[in-house]
């Protein structure tokens, strides 16, 4: 089936679970908070209560934040960024390895050394600088400026800082899925803040259904508007967009949280939403950020050279409407 741009739609950005599974009495369901956002688990775990499953998830939550959080000053990543340690343990090592793989596809648009730029633009817990000195900051941004040698992080410049926010949530979803499987689950869906990993199907034997929301700039409602439904039986899915984390600068220009590390500036284009399905949620998470940072034209060119990549883009058109792009590999997963 050939790729195509199809009818105009409203913006669809974040992924939400559609729990239309019928009677799920044989499944254990957990709802809570993880990584500071929503947590949902539905799984046919064996011999474990919802309370025990949630407690195990909270232990993983503490482990993930202690390693990869840029907001926790005591995390390993924060201490690496402040040059208080150079030790690289497994979570950091995995994130760096995946970042290198995605970065190689990105033409320089995906780079986890962007933290100083993210801070300057006000998206890492600091107030935005009125006129960030982008050129000066770019002098110590670049994946080539940091390497790992025998389990130690070596920086070419001590000002280099890492930010794994484009991977860490998806990676934690994958860790949570592994945890659920350790409790005997053969069918499950886990969701942290709209990033999803699933296996098998619902109690009736059908696929899990993931809803792609139809929000708009500033919309904070989860799951109220659904543009597309995607069937998923194995793997990860993540949706990236710039409709929640943005602000208008003094000149009225939109400044979004996705930063192009080549220019040091916000990557705002007519590409409004990117949904990626991949074998792991970490891959889907990182690829979504990569495509957003590329912008509409380059993202469309890139994905057309990747026949196995499963993506769903929503783009603004010139008439204040919207268009969809569904890659050939994704088409069979679209339910409507």
Task: Explain the meaning of each model-derived region.
Residues 2-10, 19-336:
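Mature catalytic core of soluble alpha/beta enzymes
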């Amino acid at each position: 089936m050939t790729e195509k741009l199809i009818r105009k739609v409203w913006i669809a950005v974040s992924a939400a679970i559609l729990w239309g599974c019928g009677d799920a009495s044989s499944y254990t369901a957990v709802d809570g908070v993880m990584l500071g956002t929503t947590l949902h688990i539905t799984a046919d775990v064996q011999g474990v209560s919802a309370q025990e499953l949630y407690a195990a998830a909270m232990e993983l939550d503490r482990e993930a934040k202690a390693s990869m959080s840029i907001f926790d000053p005591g995390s390993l990543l924060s201490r690496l960024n402040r040059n208080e340690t150079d030790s690289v343990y497994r979570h950091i090592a995995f994130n760096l390895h995946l970042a290198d793989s995605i970065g190689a596809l990105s033409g320089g648009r995906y780079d986890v050394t962007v933290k100083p730029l993210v801070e300057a633009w006000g998206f890492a817990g600091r107030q935005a600088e009125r006129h960030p000195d982008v050129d000066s900051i770019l002098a110590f941004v670049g994946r080539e400026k940091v390497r790992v040698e025998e389990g130690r992080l070596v920086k070419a410049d001590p000002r280099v800082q890492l930010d794994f926010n484009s991977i860490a949530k998806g990676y934690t979803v994958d860790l949570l899925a592994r945890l659920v499987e350790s409790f005997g689950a053969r069918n499950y869906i886990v969701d942290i803040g709209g990033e999803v990993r699933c296996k098998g199907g619902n109690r009736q034997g059908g696929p899990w259904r993931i809803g792609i929301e139809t929000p708009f700039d500033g919309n904070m409602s989860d799951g109220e508007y659904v543009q597309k439904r995607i069937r998923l039986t194995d793997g990860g899915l993540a949706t990236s967009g710039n409709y929640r984390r943005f602000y208008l600068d003094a000149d009225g220009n939109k400044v979004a949280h996705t930063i192009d590390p080549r220019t040091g500036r916000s990557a705002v284009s007519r590409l409004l939403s990117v949904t990626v399905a991949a074998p792991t949620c970490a891959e889907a998470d990182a690829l979504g950020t990569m495509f957003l940072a590329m912008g509409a034209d380059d993202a469309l060119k890139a994905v057309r050279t990747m026949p196995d990549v499963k993506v769903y883009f929503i783009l603004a058109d010139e008439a204040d409407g919207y268009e969809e792009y569904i890659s050939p590999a994704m088409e069979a997963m679209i339910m409507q």
